[in-house]
Amino acid sequence: MNVLVLDLETTVDRFDGKIDGSPFNPKNKCVSAHYRWQGKDGVTNLVFNHNEKLISDSIEILRTALARADVLVAHNAKFDCLWLTEMGLTLPPLIRCTMINEYILSKGQRRPLSLKATAERRDVTRKRSDLVDDLFKGGTGFEEMPLGVVLEYAEADVISCAEIYEQQLEELSLTENQSLNSVVEFMNEMLVFLLEIERNGIKVDLDALEVVKLELQNEHALLSRRLRDIVESVMGDSPINLNSGRDMTKVVYSREVSDRQLHIDVWNIGLQPNGKPKYPPRMKKAEFAKAVRDTTKIAYKTDALCCSDCNGTGKIQKYKTLTRQKNGKKYRVAGEAYKNPSKCKTCAGLGAIYHPTGQIAGLRLNPLSPSFASVNGFKTDKGTIALLISQAKGKGNDIAVEFLEKISRLNALSTYLDSFVKGLETWTRKDGILHSSFNQCITATGRLSSSNPNFQNQPKRGFPVRKAVTSRFQGGMFYEFDFSSVEFRVAGAVSRDRQVIDDVLNDKDIHKQTASIIHQIPADQVTKDQRQSCKLHSFAPLFGSMGNGLAAHEKKYYDEFFVIYKDIGKYQQRLMNGVLRNGIVASPSGRQYFWPNVERLRNGRVTNATQIVNYPIQGLAADLVQLSCIRAYKAIKSAGLNSLLVLTVHDSICLDVYPGEEEQVKTIIYDAMTGVGDEAKTRWDYDFPLPLEIEATAGKNWFDQHDIVLT
């Protein structure tokens, strides 16, 4: 086989502190291409856009090389392939990305995957970053650097990549790594699908986005005002910053850290030598309560009195002192004022003196376990707030429920505005198309991540920013096809749990069952709101959660789950025991996850238990979704449709559907997604015993969608 190892150097556009190297930015150009044939010496250099090169090399030379190649090898190959396709070049039949290979061979261990880091780890020819780093920092691009420097730098990249690829092939040939070869093939096929959706991009209606932005900003302002009112009512005049963990501890838990170092020591806060967080201490209920009292003190409401020294400004104007002499005696007088006022020492720059009233401040909620401890007191992150809302409802603490629900919504709105609205505004090109960037090598499980913006981090339903995502075709529609409860089906499949299989085949409403157990009522009496509020618990045990820290009625569900689904519990125990024996967990699709230092705990579980039981399920679910993407891509191309694959988010595939192709698209995508079980047998020799259910919606935009019937 003819294996071509390639590296491209391109210009980048710098704006608003960002660096954009995308081929979709019209300001960017391919400076040069560099390649060599595997097994042969010498690197071919082609220069297209460089200040020292008055006559560009012919792109036809590169076209000929690509046509001759059976395999294209590159590090972060998707970047190079995007540039090649946007330059009008045809890719070889097979792509092999050495970054993807290194990710797979890392077996879930977090390692730096850059070419430089990989070369150093494998002790091959080093990337010559020293040649260009200072130039880059100074704002000099490849097109402006001395051409000799560019060529030396790029040649080292090509040689390094070729040597890495050879080592990876040797490693993949080892007996213990045989299953990884199918993952290499699969992930490099998925790379081609990602090329397709990144090139197609999504159509963004910037006018609609502006309307959504104003709506979100207005809601944010209203919530902020109401939260300030609540804080004032429970904290008195104490100045509170809702973005401060220290202040939020006062508001939510009515406590503040009394001795920071003692707090850190008692709660074992910090990082282990491997960079992972330390484990919280194990404590009985009485020990935990005493530790809370020992490390924190009660926060009290305050009354504020205007500081008389600075008249409430928090600043003191000081003057330079001048020395004068009269009749032989020296004396001092005030000179001109210093340029900047000084902070008032009396009030510490606050402008007021705060006197405790003796009345306990805050919402008086309780941390539920040692895992709630943080360096600034106790946690108030998204997951913790969800648990505290349940506690507040159980206590009938209505003001706490309102505060927590509103602060949770405020945080969500801030994310919507800062990440998504701003992201769409920043990265949508002048033609109205946004080309998001997808990464296969970030999550430990194999799930995709994306950036510019991160579509994988958006809510699954009711997300108003989706109103701005529409069809580019006159009369076109935006379609989304979504796997239903894929992780639950995967868990039932890998554990062969009879009850899961029966529930799936009988179309049982699992979320209604969850609410029935939590609220201790018959399933037919569960309300829509109760079902919705309990959905977050339904599949949490699949991913290693034991319900620790939850209210008693919610914790009951986690205990009951493993009574109902006994074989899932047995499967999880087999995984933990297997890791203790050999340090490896494998998924049916061939992925391997490595935990070298797992130990048995006193409760029968093991260290890293959450990840050990989570990764194989998440990994297989991710692979089934991505396999459906590959199948959809091949089918759409084979049918020669005008409709475009544009996104995959969570467990779904999104398309921009051309008018008149609706029925064809429905049939193709339905077959692609429901057929992954059969293809799993062909690819991975794995019998998937459950049908996969697909839900589909369509609309003029991604938000205003209606259900569509699939056959």
Predicted features along the sequence, with ranges:
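Conserved catalytic palm subdomain of right-hand nucleotidyl-transferase polymerases, strongest
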Residues: 5-6, 74-75, 96-99, 472-486, ...
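Short, conserved charged micro-motifs
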Residues: 660-667
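Function-dense linear segments that define catalytic or interfacial modules
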Residues: 437-523
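Conserved "right-hand" nucleotidyltransferase catalytic core of DNA-directed polymerases
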Residues: 1-16, 27, 32, 126, ...
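Active-site-proximal helix-loop-helix substrate-binding element of RNase H-like nuclease domains
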Residues: 28-31, 35-65, 69-174, 271-272, ...
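A common structural junction motif
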Residues: 671-683
